[in-house]
A protein has these predicted regions:
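A glycine- and small-residue-enriched flexible loop/hinge signal that marks low-structured segments
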Residues: 1-185, 224, 228
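Composition- and surface-driven signal marking solvent-exposed, interaction-prone regions
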Residues: 32-34, 203, 224-226, 240, ...
């Protein structure tokens, strides 16, 4: 009942990042979070089992939603009494995503950002910038986000639990959600207006202006809105229905950067 209540919040206060710290490592709780996320255009940050890599991968395999983002292991933090204690990662990851949204924009991945207030991951996760055969990359390969130690404790992982590769990246999923939500909110004025040529042109241009603004911010690579005449038939308009299509291309995170080294003798002639 508590998780279901998240979908009852007012539209201007909708939660875009859903968590149940210390509970979402249980599948029933995670499923409930994902169900609400699906209805509210949110993402659910899911705590992993915090045992070993294989258990984390097995847990991730139980989900097939582009709105689920699984993080493992848990984190070790300093308690108020000075002792060390385990903490499920979802709350700090949610805070990191919100911070990234505010400082950089919703179209950026939260991966490779430092998680503050953390001593270390609950178990060591091997990682090296020039080594693909590490635990961190192994977990990422199976769409489990994790933490690596490099100038702080960093969140490491871009991928949701999507079965459709178009929505594999968390930042792409969230970019689509934010665009859809923004357009719906911005066009409340258009509901119940008379459907005229001017009306169709005005709505289309407002959407295109918004997409141009996003492109100028590098939030998308491009986009376009149009009113499809095959859908906007005389009968549809007579029934009070009008259709606006739009497309866009989201930027994709540089998950793997490959530098290829070539030793050549071509520049020897520059000696003289």
């Amino acid at each position: 009942a508590g998780i279901a209540a998240l979908q009852e919040t007012r539209s201007e206060m909708k939660s875009r990042i859903l968590i149940a710290p210390g509970f979402s490592q249980h599948k029933a709780v995670a499923d409930a979070l994902i169900a609400v996320a699906q209805k509210t255009r949110a993402i659910a940050v899911i705590d992993g089992p915090n045992t070993n890599d294989e258990a984390a991968i097995d847990y991730r395999a139980q989900f097939g939603s582009d709105r689920a983002y699984i993080v493992d292991p848990w984190l070790v933090v300093r308690a108020r009494d000075g002792s060390e204690q385990l903490e499920p990662p979802s709350a700090r990851v949610a805070g990191l995503i919100a911070q990234s949204d505010a400082e950089r924009g919703f179209w950026f991945s939260p991966s490779n950002q430092v998680v503050t207030g953390v001593l270390r991951p609950a178990r060591p996760v091997s990682w090296a910038i020039n080594d693909p055969n590490t635990q961190a990359n192994y977990l990422n390969e199976f769409s489990v986000a994790t933490f690596v130690s490099h100038d702080g404790i960093r969140l490491w992982g871009n991928r949701t639990c999507a079965t459709d590769s178009r929505w594999a990246f968390l930042s792409v999923r969230r970019t689509a959600d934010m665009i859809n939500e923004s357009l719906v909110k911005a066009h409340l004025w258009a509901v119940d207006r008379n459907i005229t040529r001017t009306y169709v042109e005005e709505v289309t241009e407002m959407v295109n202006a918004y997409l141009r603004q996003l492109k100028a911010q590098a939030a998308i690579l491009g986009g376009r809105c149009w009113a499809d005449p095959e859908l906007n038939t005389a009968q549809a308009i007579a029934d009070g229905r009008v259709y606006f299509d739009f497309d866009f291309t989201a930027p994709y995170p540089a998950e793997h950067i490959v530098f290829r080294s070539h030793l050549v003798g071509d520049y020897l002639e520059e000696i003289l």
